[in-house]
From Swiss-Prot:
Cofactors named for this entry: Fe cation
Residues annotated for Fe cation 1 binding in this entry: E68, E98, H101, E182
Protein keywords: Cell membrane, Iron, Membrane, Metal-binding, Monooxygenase, Oxidoreductase, Ubiquinone biosynthesis
Species in which this protein is naturally found: Alcanivorax borkumensis (strain ATCC 700651 / DSM 11573 / NCIMB 13689 / SK2)
Gene it is expressed from: coq7
Membrane topology, from the record: Peripheral membrane protein
Chief place of localization: membrane
Protein name in UniProt: 3-demethoxyubiquinol 3-hydroxylase
Family membership: Belongs to the COQ7 family.
């Protein structure tokens, strides 16, 4: 079956639609449910967590939600400029899988009595620009950005799992499934030919990540 060729206007509208769905609460629906995400009968609900723990977990999930917003933007930006069709399709498929993470984080934030970060539009725009630029430089570098981004996300998730109370089974199940998926995305991008990024680029990405985590935990 021949793939339908989209006009530049169609592509622009599709990107705009994705941005609106990513940034508008309640518009992203998960296709999957993370394993063991439903609390056990004796597991504490969000409202029964001590207030300091609830605030901390809420801040962590806000960070993770913004991270998924950035992932959506990064993949969409790369897909918009990737030269090889199979690379573009891989970016779009990864973005669809990340939509589950976005929905899970948003739902958990609501359960904890919070709202997503107000800085999401800013980080979406920045990440889209990074993704589009990476795609223009070349597909190997674009895949390298994916690998490095996912590896950094995995480190964040491991840190958050260490901080989330053992009794908060729902949050932990979400983070565990996200970690599994992100590792898969990193390996897939590397195996597809992702280049190792220069040390200055990796350090710059780490610095940007630190700015994101510091601000979105609070705002």
């Amino acid at each position: 079956m021949t793939e339908r060729r989209l006009s530049p206007l169609d592509k622009l509208l599709a990107r705009a639609d994705n941005a609106l769905r990513t940034l508008t609460p309640g518009t992203t629906q998960a296709e999957r449910t993370p394993a063991h995400a439903a609390p056990a009968p004796d597991a504490p609900e969000a409202g029964t967590l001590p207030s300091d723990q609830r605030r901390h977990v809420l801040g962590l999930m806000r960070i993770n939600h913004t991270g998924e917003v950035c992932a959506q933007a990064l993949y969409q930006g790369q897909a918009s400029t990737a030269s090889l069709p199979h690379i573009r399709h891989a970016m779009e498929e990864s973005a669809r899988e990340e939509e589950d993470h976005l929905a899970w984080c948003e739902e958990r934030i609501q359960e904890l009595g919070g709202v997503p970060s107000k800085l999401n539009p800013l980080f979406y725009a920045m990440s889209y620009a990074v993704g589009a630029t990476a795609g223009l430089i070349g597909d190997r570098w674009s895949l390298g950005f994916v690998t490095e981004t996912e590896n950094q996300v995995v480190k964040h998730l491991e840190s958050h799992l260490y901080q989330v109370p053992e009794s908060d089974l729902r949050t932990r199940a979400i983070l565990e499934q996200m970690k599994t998926d992100e590792l898969k995305h990193a390996v897939t991008a590397k195996d597809a030919g992702g280049a190792d990024l220069p040390s200055p680029v990796r350090h710059a990405m780490t610095l940007m990540s630190k700015v994101m985590t510091f601000t979105t935990y609070r705002i």
